[in-house]
Amino acid sequence: MSKSLVIVESPAKAKTINKYLGSNYVVKSSVGHIRDLPTVGSSNGEKAKAISTKGLSAEEKSAIKQEKDRNALVKRMGIDPYHQWKANYQILPGKEKVVAELKSLAKKADHIYLATDLDREGEAIAWHLREVIGGDDARFSRVVFNEITKNAIQQAFEKPEQLNLDRVNAQQTRRFLDRVVGFMVSPLLWKKVARGLSAGRVQSVAVKLVVEREREIKAFQPEEYWEIDVLTQTQAKQALRLAVTQFKGKKFEPKNATQAQSAVDFLQHADYVVSDLETKPTHSRAKAPFITSTLQQTASTRLGFGVKKTMMLAQRLYEAGYITYMRTDSTNLSQDALKMVRGYIQSHYGESYLPSKPVFYSSKENAQEAHEAIRPSDVNTLAEQLTGMDKDAVRLYDLIWRQFVACQMPAAQYDSTTVTVRAGEYELKAKGRILRFDGWTKVLPTMSKNAEDQVLPDVQLNEKLHLEHVLPEQLFTKPPARFSEAALVKELEKRGIGRPSTYAAIISTIQERGYVRVENRRFYAEKMGEIVTDRLNQSFTALMNYDFTANMENILDQIANGEKNWKTELNQFFKDFSQQLSQAELDELEGGMKPNSLVPTDINCPTCGRKMAIRTASTGVFLGCSGYALPPKERCKTTMNLIPEAELLNVLDEASETKALMERKRCPKCGTAMDSYLIDPERKIHICGHNPNCDGYVLEQGSFKIKGYDGPIVECDKCGADMHLKLGRFGKYMGCTSCDNTRKILKSGEVAPPKEEPTHFPELKCEKSDAYFVLRDGASGVFMSAHNFPKSRETRAPKVAELALYRDRLPEKLRYLADAPQHDPEGNDAIVRFSRKEKRQYVTSEKNGKATKWIVDYLGNQWVERKK
């Protein structure tokens, strides 16, 4: 009897599903996407034939060139917007074996079930599988489930569906839109601004949010204000702290020390009388069960997880069958889920914690109500009962479980009291509240104590209070808060930008592109991010408009629902976009995109004496000689690195941001906060935060050090002086305070080991150049590289036989590598590799360019073959 083939996208999901299906099913994983549009640099098909342009007019030559460029672009993109959006999908590198196995199994199967995830991405993977496997479409069925439980799996297989091509087309539309913008705008940025830049349909809008917040902060000028508290004692000798709230019937808000002192002088001799007492019941309701965005936000604030980590852990929990699908914008709960959780609450917490009827929460507009909120698959499974999950996954599950249970429990009840006191024409208040019934907080305690969570002492109306102290405090208004990852997701969701399936990718992409950076879990806009945002805003107004981007998400929803034709929408977008692109490619004087301008200074070039200019590249802000614009023979390429002042590395919160803003110089031209950089120990330059839009700068002479440094200190391996954390054009590094020695900061945050001098092997020639190999020891272990790096970038793994031959040249700590076996049992050369996970070297071999299964480890001062 033939069996049915079930295809899912992940091995973990396949393993879980396999437990619930009988022996008549074979469950296999596609390990994600099996095909996609061509990757950058890949080229399939014949090379375009050269066309002779001899004897043609300039217009004809131009037309031929345009056609050639267009064809090259279409080939790189893998989609053809000029011919009905024909797509050139290719099997992904490394997926050939997976595809071959699935095709082989499909031939033997009587039916094929496509059980990929229930979102559009999952629908698209299912469609690609059907297209690649081929055959009669009637052999394929689509099964979807919100949770990987026995009941959900059985129900899905009892009612299989057909592939939803509308949802597939919505996914293709998003992919094609992103492809067009990325492949057609990025080259324009290379030409107009700087090499290596990129643009994205949603990515650029997300960067714009960070850039606008950065500029709000830089333009913000903190204003002084004062608050005054008065510490009193009741007739019963109990302490009561009061805040001054009004003066002469108006809000009390002194702006300076003089106004505050005037109030203090009066309050120190005033009589304090209780003028009003008010106690009223208040309550606090639980929040809705998690959707993708709220899970990401709460995991950030409660657990300290980044968006990417949260989704990775949630994916594992889902694939193991512990939670429902984690990409959702619906707060809806199924009737079965409500019955399950209400039964749990009743049996474990009692009737008083069970509302008379289920609690329902409204979802945002366009939410897919067919989906459920994120919840445990089985509320009876507690976090400590999970198996095969790491500690952080268990913590995330516990959070999801508690939110799910709490959302179906009654509100927490309080008695809130306000005491009002008169002191002449001043009014003072104290607020407190007493918890009467904990409700949902029994399961999900609040993170921090509310300022009003205090028990006020008993006082009587008209009671006179005894003055203890008047406590004035100087404060300053705070700038807008920087975005955290979670806060940026919240802002994207509020503006309708992106969807649950794309939030994590957006957050990761904008960091990888180098337009923003994250310090202390808060976003900072890089200068190049500001410049690119300005250029795109100027030339692609619609593309950078928040409402336009949100509307495009709605259009994608309509395509998925079969309400709009996907190619019609693509054609309309491409028509408008192409017009804007053509305009942007023109010269600036003709209305084209403005190039990346430099800001001249009075600083002399140390090489040629010409003036240096403030320049911005994808690696940061630096000084470059104005002579760089001259013809090649006269060109001066001198640059000077600018080191941001170190105190900017340690801004932890809005209060610190306020202090830093107050200490920063203001631009003499526009008043914006200036960014300060060290040129050398004698010169500091302050550059307008709006550079290059504003050319304001201030050069300061003196003797400079990094002031107030309290960061990590490492002993310099060359001179013994202290090395401090610094921030340069290429990111953080440790720099010596005495010599010019530097050390990298690894991705883990650890300081890289001191740089070892390479071991030279003039006898070992490179294959791709006239250079010879040297042995380098880096953060990823030992490797062979060209001696003249970076001129020649050739690298390879060291062979044990080579190390053994020149053993005496090796540093003492590496000589153990020369003692390893020089060949595997089949006679293949043994090579040295590095395990990132275990952070140690091991020896293996290769055959025909592919790794063998032979591995030898260095254990207990000897080389031991690993058991297969």
From Swiss-Prot:
Residues 164-581 form the Topo IA-type catalytic domain. A zinc finger (C4-type) spans 605-636, 667-694, 716-739. GO terms for molecular function: DNA binding; DNA topoisomerase type I (single strand cut, ATP-independent) activity; zinc ion binding. The keyword Magnesium applies. Coiled coil: none annotated. The record marks 33, 174-175, 178, 190, 327, 513 as: Interaction with DNA. One of its GO terms (cellular component) is chromosome. Its cofactor is Mg(2+). Mg(2+) binds at residues 9, 117. InterPro entries: TOP1_Znf (IPR049330), Topo_IA (IPR000380), Topo_IA_2 (IPR003601), Topo_IA_AS (IPR023406), Topo_IA_cen (IPR013497), Topo_IA_cen_sub1 (IPR013824), Topo_IA_cen_sub2 (IPR013825), Topo_IA_cen_sub3 (IPR013826). The active site is at 325 (o-(5'-phospho-dna)-tyrosine intermediate). The keyword Zinc-finger applies. Releases the supercoiling and torsional tension of DNA, which is introduced during the DNA replication and transcription, by transiently cleaving and rejoining one strand of the DNA duplex. Introduces a single-strand break via transesterification at a target site in duplex DNA. The scissile phosphodiester is attacked by the catalytic tyrosine of the enzyme, resulting in the formation of a DNA-(5'-phosphotyrosyl)-enzyme intermediate and the expulsion of a 3'-OH DNA strand. The free DNA strand then undergoes passage around the unbroken strand, thus removing DNA supercoils. Belongs to the type IA topoisomerase family. This is DNA topoisomerase 1. It comes from Pasteurella multocida (strain Pm70). The lineage of its organism: Bacteria, Pseudomonadati, Pseudomonadota, Gammaproteobacteria, Pasteurellales.
